[in-house]
């Protein structure tokens, strides 16, 4: 299991979700994608994305610096 990182800071939704989707082919089953984003609607977008693709959203929360961090398992 590997952890890949994606910094989507500065992008407005749905751009962070599009960046997440573009990484799908790079990840293997069990890998985790850690995403940092500062879009105010990121949490709702990423929850819907994970639900649609049936990917576990392991964690989502405030990073302490005004940004959100989430972990998506593939």
Task: Spell out what each predicted region is.
Residues 1-5, 32-34, 67-69:
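Intrinsic-disorder/low-complexity, polar/charged segments enriched in Ser/Thr/Lys/Arg/Asp/Glu/Gln
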Residues 47-74:
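C-terminal structural segments of small proteins and small subunits
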Residues 19-55:
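Amphipathic, hydrophobic secondary-structure cores in small proteins
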Residues 7, 36, 60-61:
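Solvent-exposed beta-strand sheet faces enriched in polar/charged residues
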Residues 1-29:
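An N-terminal amphipathic alpha-helical segment
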């Amino acid at each position: 299991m590997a952890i890949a990182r994606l910094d989507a800071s500065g992008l407005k939704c749905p751009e962070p979700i599009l960046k997440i989707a573009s990484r799908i082919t790079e990840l293997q089953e069990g890998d985790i994608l850690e995403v940092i984003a500062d879009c105010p609607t990121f949490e709702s977008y990423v929850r819907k994305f994970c639900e649609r693709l049936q990917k576990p959203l392991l964690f989502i929360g405030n990073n302490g610096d005004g940004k959100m961090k989430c972990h998506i398992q593939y």
